[in-house]
Amino acid sequence: MKTAEIRRRYLAHFEANGHAVVPSAPLPAISDPNLLFVAAGMMQFVPYFLGQQTAPYKRAVSVQKCLRTPDIDEVGKTSRHGTFFQMNGNFSFGDYFKDEAIPLAWDLATKSVDAGGFGLDPERIWPTVYLDDDEAYEVWRSVGVPADRIVRRGKADNFWSMGIPGPCGPCSELFYDRGPEYGLEGGPAVDEDRYLEFWNLVFMQFERGPGTGKEDYPILGDLPAKNIDTGMGLERMASILQGVDNLYEIDEVRPILDRAAELTGKRYGAHSGHVASESHPDDVRLRVVADHVRTALMLIGDGVTPSNEGRGYVLRRIMRRAIRSIRLLGWQERAMPELLPVARDCMSPSYPELAADFGRIADYAYAEEDAFLSTLRAGTTILDTAIAESRTAGRRAISGAQAFQLHDTYGFPIDLTLEIANEQGMQVDAEGFRRLMADQRARAKADAQARKTGHVDLSAYRTVLDEGGPVTFTGYHEVSRESTVRAVLGEAGPRAAAVEGDTVELVLDTTPFYAEGGGQQPDLGVITVGGGQVEVLDVQQPVPGLIVHRARVLRGEVRAGETGFAEIDASRRRAISRSHTATHLVHQTMRNFLGESATQAGSLNAPGRLRFDFNTPTGVAPSVLRDVEQQVNEALLADLEVRAFVTSLAEARRIGAMALFGEKYGEQVRVVEVGDYARELCGGTHVARSGQLGLVKILSESSIGSGVRRVEALVGIDAFNFLAREHLLVARLAELYRVPSDQVADRVEQTVSQLRDAEKELEKLRAQLVLGGAAALAAQATEVRGVAYVGTEAPEGASGNDVRTLAQEIRGRIDPARPAVVAVAARSNGKASLVVAVNQAARSRGLSAADLVKAAFAGRGGGSPELAQGGGLPAAEAPGLLRTVENAIAGA
């Protein structure tokens, strides 16, 4: 059975049993700042399980895209480890419990293929239950599982919690007996290679207290509502139903592996048994390639692009491991163009958007491979040198400083340094590397604390939210309103009041203040309460539904429970709204010219200006940028109506509303339309008509990272003022040149060209002046102990290069058979410098230019025995430097 069919049957089974089919959340864990990626099927439902939000459905089913990388080094070595995987899951939020969850799972697993099930042999399924979970045990008995195949296990195996105080409960796992060829009989407790877990049913029924470790925590009591969270690894089930040994051999992965084997001339499985950990290195590398290429496809498909930070670095590391693995197998050409299309064909039956978006995905993948191959060539050479030097010095490890230099200067990742060093029997001072990295991060983030808004502990916010519910935002339609202060928060948490001079956080019951989000800067303004007034400095939403105003008390006091008047800076809001609407127009226009791969990667909507970051593998030509600007302003002239409305996510997608990569949307979304020109999911504020923007002027386009470009623009009166200043500047230049303004650029180019020619001529004349006396100076050489010595000062204004050239020119005009030393001193910016040139005949007498310079500068300076230089002494010391060299020759 194909993996896509397993997925379809799973969703269909639970949809037929009253479950809402919920799309997978994107791989980036947008809703949790502490996580990079979604790693479990239940993650998008956590707010429902914790009671932070009310679920819009009682029961749900999904197939969640997941990524786990802590064990990335084990990928390919065992049958259990992979980076990307899919988790089938069915969930109940206070609806059904064990008595329905277990039969639902059993029915799908054992129902015949013809009837829509998976057709597993009931005699080969072994359920496990928690030690004292008699309830689950009895349900398993009721569906027909004999007692000797129901295994009771302890807390470490069959009791689930999130690792923190909160929901917890026993779980029941389903294992499938793959047969005696895979190991010992006796059930999951005896051999988990033979008995493969394929489904875990978690029964959330208790609340746990604080504790350490996996088992050391108290059970505080029952939850008000009991929940179900199940997870079936899609790849695990596919390996069972397709009769293959491991997840690398299922239909969504094996074609990639086979193509890699074909390219490298390797025969997969020639050295393997059933246990993947016993495989030959060639097989391990082929599995790494297959796993990582598929993962790269899915990550880029979900909007992640290669970089040196966060999610982008994980993608970069995965891609580079795949590329290096296939090179170690013997393939030295570009691999991604050969493998990525195969991965697309494997995954697009379940994710058709991968085929539609493949042009963009391929652009990033191929560009990253090209960049890495260049890095690999340079970095490997440097690393090989470092390894050789360490061995010569008798060291068994590469220093942390060398590893850091490879990473920081050459972009050579530390994991690759560790891997290559290990292959050559060397270690790396990883602790020293981490220390240097920590120092660098500390410097880069020195001001992070100063910029931080809000409490480290979010519990204060959650308490306010739980007690009063979500804050109502009214700012779409009004700029001021009467509001009640629900809470006053200080650094230590809630407080009764704040007095003049205090900076606190205020929570109102309703507010017209927009909280920073979606690239839009927050509203500023004032809140007047009783006899007090506060200035709003910042507005944030630290937890969903709670708008928090960071404010300074200007006079009087502010108390929780008082009613007052909240008023935003309306002029600032209008300017920000103009910028936000302009960003939508720039986004759509970029896609018009560059294609749908030009997706938004970030934005800033500030008063009078915008910054728009977008994904594209190459820069934007100036001519295209001009066309984009013109088309945006034509949309302004059309005075299009700007309309915002709320609809279902499915309907928004149907009408073509753009959604941002990586964003997690609810069932209901807000759509902003600018006529028929642009349509985008957005929660920000906008103008009523496009004509209200006035003018958009693009200032610049630049790179801010691999595959990410940035456009900056001015909007409205700021754009007009900029153009007015530019006009005055051009008019002034036209006046100076006495030409029409449209000829100014040509005249400036002509002036610059003339200036460059003059500089070249000046340089030529200066060189002639400096070198013109070289022959005469050589003829005036004096004898110092059988050595021809020329000591002279360079003409005023001579450059450092001129001085070196003069010294060598004089040396070249002295008979090579005659030992000669030339010393040329120079004065520049109040300092004296010296260049010494020594010919080969003088070298044979034991004279060294480097030694003579060090004699003149008390050990400082340097160079080769033939040519050396030094500097830094006061200009008046120039004659003395020449005498010192002469004396050094005399004493040699």
UniProtKB/Swiss-Prot annotation:
Zn(2+) binds at H580, H584, C682, H686. It is an enzyme of class 6 (ligase). SUPFAM superfamilies: Class II aaRS and biotin synthetases (SSF55681), Putative anticodon-binding domain of alanyl-tRNA synthetase (AlaRS) (SSF101353), ThrRS/AlaRS common domain (SSF55186), Translation proteins (SSF50447). Its EC number is 6.1.1.7. Its cofactor is Zn(2+). Disulfide bonds: none annotated. GO terms for molecular function: alanine-tRNA ligase activity; aminoacyl-tRNA deacylase activity; ATP binding; tRNA binding; zinc ion binding. It catalyses: tRNA(Ala) + L-alanine + ATP = L-alanyl-tRNA(Ala) + AMP + diphosphate. One of its GO terms (cellular component) is cytosol. Catalyzes the attachment of alanine to tRNA(Ala) in a two-step reaction: alanine is first activated by ATP to form Ala-AMP and then transferred to the acceptor end of tRNA(Ala). Also edits incorrectly charged Ser-tRNA(Ala) and Gly-tRNA(Ala) via its editing domain. CDD domains: AlaRS_core. Consists of three domains; the N-terminal catalytic domain, the editing domain and the C-terminal C-Ala domain. The editing domain removes incorrectly charged amino acids, while the C-Ala domain, along with tRNA(Ala), serves as a bridge to cooperatively bring together the editing and aminoacylation centers thus stimulating deacylation of misacylated tRNAs. Belongs to the class-II aminoacyl-tRNA synthetase family. It comes from the Bacteria. Keywords: Aminoacyl-tRNA synthetase, ATP-binding, Cytoplasm, Ligase, Metal-binding, Nucleotide-binding, Protein biosynthesis, RNA-binding, tRNA-binding, Zinc. Pfam families: tRNA-synt_2c (PF01411), tRNA_SAD (PF07973). Gene3D superfamilies: 2.40.30.130, 3.10.310.40, 3.30.54.20, 6.10.250.550, Bira Bifunctional Protein, Domain 2, Threonyl-trna Synthetase, Chain A, domain 2. It comes from Salinispora arenicola (strain CNS-205). This is Alanine--tRNA ligase. It is found in: Cytoplasm. Binds 1 zinc ion per subunit. One of its GO terms (biological process) is alanyl-tRNA aminoacylation.
